[in-house]
Regions:
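Structural register within alpha-helical repeat arrays
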Residues: 73, 113, 152, 194, ...
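DNA major-groove recognition helix of helix-turn-helix/homeodomain DNA-binding modules
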Residues: 44-61
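Structural motif corresponding to the intra-repeat A-B loop/turn of tetratricopeptide repeats
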Residues: 80, 120, 159, 201, ...
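A short, Lys/Arg-rich alpha-helix, primarily the initiator
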Residues: 1-15
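Amphipathic alpha-helical segments of tetratricopeptide repeats
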Residues: 91-98, 130-138, 170-181, 212-223, ...
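Short alpha-helical DNA-recognition segment
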Residues: 16-35
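Alpha-solenoid helical repeat architecture
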Residues: 101-107, 140-147, 181-189, 222-229, ...
């Protein structure tokens, strides 16, 4: 009798759209079926046989030595983000799910399915899978808990809940040595994503340390695309601590790898990052040159990347007081948002606020920031963006002679910066 018979019965009961009452009728009590499905009772063989007959499945293990290999290949394809292979293997695994259950791989498959849905941007399915997995988490083994933390973090990152993602990636890291022997690609994939998430949150110390650790591994193992991404992360964090020469060096190393790989994805990130560097240095001519190179790689894709390149132009033309150029590029941003309805809110808010910057501040600006923008960034602990918008609202109040309110918002912006340093130093 399969040790995972409860999981098998539950899976196929749900697949056949049967309630526990419908499946149990005339065979066992509902409470006993519930215990069988949770593997909380030693199942009666005769009862299990009848339940399986009703579901059209075998009460015995259907052993297939190939299914374990297929599952391992699928997990590896997800780790390497080979989505074409992952899709093909996923179809085969779903067709042979009974064999997966009998091989005691069902829980690992369920966990990796969450990650598969995240990578393939099947958001609704990912949310549904996350909800179901939460119900099972207290029964996870250490290995299953590791993947649960890691893949939940990926889901949270995709949902812009970066602080939650960061904490769960770190929890997974602490559990890693209890599950795996030695440092593997799995480990450095986790380390890379800690660095990436820390960079979004402006945790410069964590981002730099983790990016360097990941870079050494990917460079030594000739994983050039990941190595390039690590150089970009290091460059971004050097820029934030005003080490501009070192930042540019990292970006140039990434650019060389991007050209070697003929990777527009890498080159876009490099050109965008160099554009930001020159923008920060108040060198608008150079900034526009790189933002334009970035834009040429992604125009007409209606993507976050295209919007970022557009916003780089808007902000840089504002910086050098070329308002008409800024307005032209802002119209491109508006057109993109009308076409692509699912753009993350952090970018939508940038466009809305820049419109006020270019066309004048009104009471609608105050309402937008107080009711929507500031709460959004505060709730996600995106403190740099939060501080920027809080300070902008402070300027609005100051210019309208509401000095007490302005002082309160300036103080809040300062506290947000302190909070970043405090969290990064933990």
């Amino acid at each position: 009798m399969s040790n995972g018979i409860g999981e098998k019965i539950k899976y196929f009961r749900i697949k056949h759209n049967l309630t526990q009452e419908e499946l149990a009728k005339g065979i066992v009590s509902v409470s006993y079926l519930s215990k069988i499905e949770r593997n909380a009772a030693d199942p009666n063989p005769e009862a299990v046989k009848k339940l399986c007959e009703r579901l059209g499945i075998s009460p015995e293990k259907v052993l297939d030595k190939d299914i374990a290999n297929d599952v391992m290949r699928w997990m590896e394809s997800l780790l390497k983000r080979d989505l074409v292979l992952a899709h093909d293997l996923y179809q085969g695994i779903q067709t042979n799910i009974e064999k997966v259950i009998d091989a005691d791989l069902f829980c690992l498959v369920k966990l990796h399915t969450l990650y598969y849905f995240v990578l393939t941007k099947q958001t609704d399915k990912a949310k549904q899978k996350l909800k179901l997995l939460k119900q099972d988490q207290k029964h996870f083994s250490k290995k299953e808990t590791y993947y649960w933390l890691k893949f939940k973090a990926h889901f949270e990152y995709a949902e812009s809940s970066y602080e939650k993602a960061f904490l769960h990636f770190q929890e997974a890291e602490r559990l890693y040595s209890d599950v795996f022997k030695g440092d593997s690609e799995e480990y450095y994939d986790l380390i890379y994503h800690v660095a990436k998430t820390a960079t979004v949150l402006h945790y410069s110390y964590h981002a730099s340390v983790y990016a360097e650790r990941a870079l050494i591994y990917y460079r030594d193992h000739y994983r050039l695309e990941r190595a390039a991404k690590c150089h970009i992360l290091k460059g971004v964090n050097y820029k934030r601590i005003r080490e501009m020469d070192e930042a540019l060096k990292q970006f140039e190393l990434a650019e060389a790898l991007g050209k070697r790989l003929s990777s527009d994805t890498i080159l876009f990130r490099v050109y965008e990052a160099i554009g930001e560097l020159f923008h920060d240095l108040k060198m608008p001519t150079q900034a526009i040159r790189y933002y334009s190179k970035a834009y040429e790689l992604v125009k007409h894709q209606f993507s976050v990347q295209e919007l970022n390149a557009i916003l780089g132009h808007v902000k840089t033309y504002i910086q050098c007081d070329k308002q008409e150029f800024s307005k032209d590029w802002l119209e491109k941003a508006d057109t993109l948002l009308k076409t692509e309805k699912n753009m993350p809110l952090r970018y939508v808010y940038q466009v809305k606020v820049l419109r006020f910057v270019l066309y004048g501040f009104t009471t609608q600006f105050e309402k937008l920031l107080v009711k929507e923008v500031i709460p959004y960034f505060k709730s996600r602990k995106l403190y740099i963006a939060y501080a920027t918008y809080v300070r902008l609202l402070g300027d609005y109040y100051y210019n309208n002679r509401k000095y007490k309110l302005a002082a309160e918002y300036y103080a809040e912006a300062h506290q947000a910066m302190v909070d970043i340093q405090h969290t990064d130093n933990k």
